[in-house]
């Protein structure tokens, strides 16, 4: 997979190095030469750039990357402007780092709904989530195994767990299935959880499936979706 990480402070550099070590193609960008020079041997490609300059940003391979992560934390203004430029250039998968509720609100207003909050999520876990497409949540069991929550693929809706055959096809264990139950007009929505569901379970619209297994197998399942 290919990623661009903009902003190589502690969070951004940790994320970029983690992705590089896992064999992904990474372009790391910072506006400080000192940071670029310090990280040149730890990240696949690293460059100095002012990403608030639209013409400079246009030189990046934006359409040939799986995600662009704006990890700028010190300068909120630069973060917002950089994200606005990426949005204007119609980059498909943009992830913005947020540092406050107000920052998140502004990003939502400019159409950046995919955000991360490093103070509550580690760079390693965000690295995992970037690798497993469509994952709603990832919990690391050990260096090889994870538990992942996915929205059930549309093609599985109205079909049984046995038909999906995740165990044989992907060597993944279905731990639980979460179902959103909509109540009446005056009552709230409720999420019910089915632990260790039977093979006869029939998937419903908006179900969330919780599966456990090797990270590599999760990636294969995610690609199929």
Label the predicted regions.
Residues 2, 160-225:
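Cytosolic Rossmann-like ligand/nucleotide-binding regulatory domains
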Residues 92, 112, 144-146, 170-173:
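A generic structural signal for short beta-strands and their flanking turns/coil linkers
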Residues 136-141, 198-201:
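Short, flexible, solvent-exposed loop/turn segments with mixed acidic/basic and small polar residues
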Residues 8, 31, 99, 179, ...:
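Cofactor-binding loop segments of dinucleotide-utilizing enzymes, especially the Rossmann-like FAD-
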Residues 4-19, 152-157:
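Glycine-rich adenosine-cofactor-binding loop
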Residues 138-169:
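Extended boundary segments
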Residues 11, 15-16, 20-27, 31-132, ...:
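Cytosolic ligand/metal-binding cores
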């Amino acid at each position: 997979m290919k990623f661009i990480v903009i902003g190589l402070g502690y969070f951004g550099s940790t994320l970029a190095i983690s992705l590089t070590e896992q064999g992904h193609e990474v372009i790391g960008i910072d506006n400080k030469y000192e940071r670029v020079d310090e990280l040149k041997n730890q990240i696949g490609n690293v460059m100095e750039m002012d990403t608030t300059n639209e013409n400079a940003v246009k030189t990046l391979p934006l359409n040939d990357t799986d995600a662009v992560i704006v990890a700028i934390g010190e300068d909120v203004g630069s973060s917002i402007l950089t994200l606005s430029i990426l949005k204007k250039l119609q980059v498909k998968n943009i992830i913005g780092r947020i540092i406050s509720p107000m920052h998140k609100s502004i990003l939502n207003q400019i159409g950046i709904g995919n955000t991360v909050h490093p103070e509550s999520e580690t760079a390693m876990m965000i690295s995992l989530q970037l690798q497993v497409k469509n994952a709603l949540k990832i919990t690391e069991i050990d260096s090889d195994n994870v538990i992942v929550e996915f929205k059930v693929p549309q093609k599985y809706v109205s079909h049984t767990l046995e038909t999906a055959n995740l165990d044989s096809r992907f060597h993944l264990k279905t731990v639980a299935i979460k179902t959103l139950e909509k109540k009446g007009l005056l009552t709230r929505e409720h999420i019910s959880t089915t632990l260790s569901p039977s093979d006869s379970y029939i998937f419903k619209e908006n179900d969330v499936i919780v599966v456990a297994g090797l990270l590599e197998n999760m990636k294969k399942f995610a690609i199929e979706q």
